[in-house]
Amino acid sequence: MENIDDLWNKVLEEMKKKVSKPSYETWLRATKANALQNNDTIIVTAPNEFARDWLEDHYSGLTSDIIEQLTGARLTPKFVIPQHNQEEEALPEQTPQTPPEKDVAGQSTLSQTMLNDKYTFNTFVIGSGNRFAHAASLAVAEAPARAYNPLFIYGGVGLGKTHLMHAIGHYVMEHNPNAKVVYLSSEKFTNEFINAIRDNKAVHFRNKYRNVDVLLIDDIQFIAGKIQTQEEFFHTFNALHEESKQIVISSDRPPKEIPTLEDRLRSRFEWGLITDITPPDLETRIAILRKKAKAENLDIPNEVMLYIANQIDTNIRELEGALIRVVAYSSLINQDMNADLAAEALKDIIPNAMPKTLTITDIQKLVGEHFQVKLEDFKAKKRTKSVAFPRQIAMYLSREMTDASLPKIGSEFGGRDHTTVIHAHEKISKLLATDQELQQKVQAITEQLRQ
């Protein structure tokens, strides 16, 4: 059989002919074939878990058919995500592995880092909730072991801790190619330590992690309660710190709140700088969605990004997942994206989504309270800015948050034409993309209406 990369490129070319362009761009363009397994399975990487599941459900059969047409052999695709995205999603043994690790510092760096190419400082969106953590991470990357050592980053799931750790690793390696950088989770550290003891390779294990320039260890809270692992990490920490090697640690909570963590480890974690990351505000959430859309070559209307940003304020992972879901839904039903479609796509994962039973009068009353406009003025012919602009906001929200048709909305605003409603919606949508003060006002009104 021909080279697997060439084969997969041919498969993708055939896919372009058989699926819509949005579907191809959303699901297939970023895939890559890695290896053959047992001569009957082709291993294909997808960019994330959602894409992997979608590909399995919708494109497995078509993939097999195309491969059979091209080669005469029927292969079953197995869609996986890269190991650096999810360690437990281990690729099979037949998958080409990175070069063997060497214990000599400065060699085989890439084989140990397992860094995600997408997680760099350039792709990190800075906001009020992560500004200090970003600055500290950049300082550490620019001057390892001279700025803050250790650097301890904590925060909830999906807020960017891992992104910053990978960014530090990339920056160090870019500016010092001979540096030995290792990134791993504390769970992996624990598993490797257990295996090393079982296989009588404790010395090899210690050499591996005590002869590095930068150690990036994620989710340190998982070693809590594991006495032997804590003992080993304590000595690893000491060895690196004494040699002025940089240590960066992440957790879902500060050291003092990690239960069953030994006091001697807790005190060492507090030697350097402790910084937290909090959930992103509305402006940051919109910026994250824009950057994600740009990175994925997706054309997402502003109203859709605003809708998603208003609905999901927990973490970045859920925010980006919601965007992918909306894109997928739009591709599946072959309809253009708008706020109504986004609401439909996300109704199963957002239990408190904007209620469609809301009335236009409810919206007019609340907008009027915020802008000191009387209810009757929304229906009057007044065109002064103090009335016209709030009226346009109310029209925009009526379009976003109710099922009312354009003529119906127009009639509720003094019998105005549906084109007036369209103009108001377009105007406010554009302003929301750039006007932070307006974003805050509309968000406040939206949240009140949701309640």
From Swiss-Prot:
Q: Where is this region: Domain I, interacts with DnaA modulators?
A: 1-93
Q: Which PROSITE patterns match?
A: DNAA
Tell me, which GO biological process terms does this entry list? DNA replication initiation; regulation of DNA replication
One GO molecular-function entry: DNA replication origin binding
Segment Domain IV, binds dsDNA: which positions?
331-451
**Annotated positions binding ATP:** G158, G160, K161, T162
The UniProt annotation puts the region (Domain II) at: 94-113
* Gene3D superfamilies given in the database record: 1.10.1750.10, 1.10.8.60, 3.30.300.180, P-loop containing nucleotide triphosphate hydrolases (3.40.50.300)
Map out region (Domain III, AAA+ region) in residue numbers.
Answer: 114-330
Annotated InterPro entries: AAA+_ATPase (IPR003593), Chromosome_initiator_DnaA (IPR001957), Chromosome_initiator_DnaA-like (IPR020591), Chromosome_initiator_DnaA_CS (IPR018312), DnaA_C (IPR013159), DnaA_dom (IPR013317), DnaA_N_dom (IPR024633), DnaA_N_sf (IPR038454)
Q: Which HAMAP family match?
A: DnaA_bact
**Domain notes from UniProt:** Domain I is involved in oligomerization and binding regulators, domain II is flexibile and of varying length in different bacteria, domain III forms the AAA+ region, while domain IV binds dsDNA.
Subunit organization: Oligomerizes as a right-handed, spiral filament on DNA at oriC.
Q: What does this protein do?
A: Plays an essential role in the initiation and regulation of chromosomal replication. ATP-DnaA binds to the origin of replication (oriC) to initiate formation of the DNA replication initiation complex once per cell cycle. Binds the DnaA box (a 9 base pair repeat at the origin) and separates the double-stranded (ds)DNA. Forms a right-handed helical filament on oriC DNA; dsDNA binds to the exterior of the filament while single-stranded (ss)DNA is stabiized in the filament's interior.
Q: What is this protein called?
A: Chromosomal replication initiator protein DnaA
Organism for this UniProt entry: Shouchella clausii (strain KSM-K16)
